[in-house]
Structures are given as C-alpha cells and as structure tokens.
Amino acid sequence: MSDDRTWMLRALRLATLSLGRTWPNPGVGAVVVKDGRLLGQGRHAVYGQAHAEVNALGHCRAQGLDPAGATVYVTLAPCTRHGKQPPCVAALVAALGDPNQDEAADLLAAAGIAYEEGCLEELATRLHGGFLSRVAVGRPRFTGKWAMTLDGSLATGELDSAWISSLPALASSRRRRRVFDGIVSGSGTAFHDDPSLLSAQVGERTPVRIVLSSRAELKDGSMLVATRAKAPVLVVHGAQAPADNLAALRSHAIELLAVADPHDPLQVAQALGQYGFNELLVEGGAHIHGAFLRAGLYDRLELYTGFATLGGGLPVCSGLGVATIAEGQRWEAEGPPRLLGETVALRLRRPRPVGAADQEPVVVIG
C-alpha cells in the first residue's frame, strides 16, 4: 500500500468514531503528515464544533509541532463556506471532493496549496454514503435490520419474537445503533413491542428514535416517551393527524414531522433528508420492511439469523411482486458472516458496478 493510501486509511478509520454524531454534517477524519511522520490528527466530532482539519492542525500546534509544509489527509474535501465554521483550507489536502461545492481546488491553488482527490475514493464514498445520498438525491442512506429464523420468519403467527437472536447478537445489534443518526420504527412495532430503541449500555449515545405514525399516536406509557430524557423521539405523521394527538405528543416534548402521505416511503425518505439525517437504521416489522424494499430505499441490510424454525410464522416481507428468481433484489456481502452465539450476523449492500476494484476494508465500530 502506498504512503498516501496508508495515511488516508488512518483518516478513514478516525472518521468512523464520528458516525452518528455530526449530522447533518459528515463525520470527517484528518491526519497531518510531514516527511513520513504523523504530526497530528483530528475529526469533526460534534455538529457545530471544529472541523476535522482544524482539529488536526490544532493537535499539531498543541504538541509544539509546526505543520508548515505538511500534507493533510482528509476523508472529504475541506469546507470553503461560511456556516458554523470559518473556511478551513490552510493546508495540503488529498481527499474525496465535497459534493456541496466545487471551488476547493481553485481556492487551495490560489493559496499555493497542492490539491489532489481520489485517494481511496471508493472507501470514502462508502463511509460518507449517507451524506452523499442526501446531497445528491435528497434522502438519507437507509439500512434495514431484522432478526429472523432459519425459515425466514420475523415472529410466530401469534407475533411472538422474543427472542429469535442470541443474547450476544442482541447486544451487538444494540451497540450498532450508535453509529446511525436515527432509528426508524413503524407504529405497529412501537405499539406491539414497545421498544425503547436505546443503545446497549447506560450512558452510551443513542440516535434519534423515529416512529412513523400517520395519526401521530404512541402507546400510553410508551417506553419511547418514558425514556425521552435519554434520547430524542421524532414522530413522522400525516398532515391530517388529529390535533389532540399532536398536542399530547408535544406535551411530552416529542418532536413532530408532517408529511402529506406517511404511507409513501419515498415521501418519508425525502422529509427525513430535509430534516438533515444522513444515515438511518430501520428496525420494524414486515410492513415497514416490505414498503422500503418495494420502494428500493434500502442501501444496506443487517441480518441476524437465529437457529430456529417456525414453519408458518410471520415472513420478513411480502408483496414485492417478484415472479421469477431473476427479478429478485440481489445483494452482496459487506465483510464475512459473524457467529454470535446461536445466531449468524450478516451485513449486505447493494452490488457495486461491474469491475469495481476491491479495496482495504474500513473498520466500522460496532
């Protein structure tokens, strides 16, 4: 691996520590290198705070090291717009371009700074895919997650699903929540299962809990309401939701987002993109998974298969309108399967274009 790729891979791994913490901004990582030596590193850790390259250069100076003449490796081109932060283009850069603006190269060149894009571009695109999706098509990147039996059931015919997955798998899946901006659930799951959708450990960051409810309803004594102080709750509702329901949710400090047709996943996706979400995990039942699969909204899947059979349980989804195997949606593995007790965990993604080169994997926490 070339030196450039080595340092960029370090920046990418650093950026994974910011997953779920910086939306609507991407969680960028940066390292400062001079004469083959690491001088400093930094990341955009929280929305509204310093950007990655600012923190990396500050790390150099805090150690009494002069970054003059160094190369800054960033996972996304530096910001050149005034917003929460001033322009931060004061160092050499090699990175993926920022889709929000294209003047970075000109500004850097005018300042006498060499600029190069494309080092580990595919990995940077994969890491920042949610942000890139929101900028390009107006919606977040969605990951569908479910636990199922060996014969593809989410639950028994009586809707019992506790627990298909092993305890190690449950703990792993809950830890994974923290790398997303939000967790999406349907109203049926919210009523029947009454999940808290919190992360695995006390004090650990939990994303925004998002419930799709056309009538803006949550169960009386809901765990989501009871745990509101631990993480925000957002209810996506229809434009004609009863005023009393909206008032009741507001009284519990529940955030509200109206869409014209909450049963249309494409409208929901656009609304959540406008809200600022980059990466969303969908945890729900057959109805919501079927709707998102039919709409082609899932970019990734995280599947947990428990070693049980039900024979006639509730299927993962239905109504995809597929008549032949060739018409089915195809996926490719994103890393090897993992054995978690009596459960196999598998991460999938939409297939890459034919001929796309394999690159070193980014280590994602979780």
Regions picked out by a protein language model, each given a short descriptive name:
Residues G97-D151, L167:
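Contiguous mid-protein beta-loop-alpha structural module that forms a pocket-lining wall or clamp
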Residues G29:
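Helix-turn-helix
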Residues V32-L123, V208, L234, A239-A241, ...:
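Zn2+-dependent cytidine deaminase-like catalytic core
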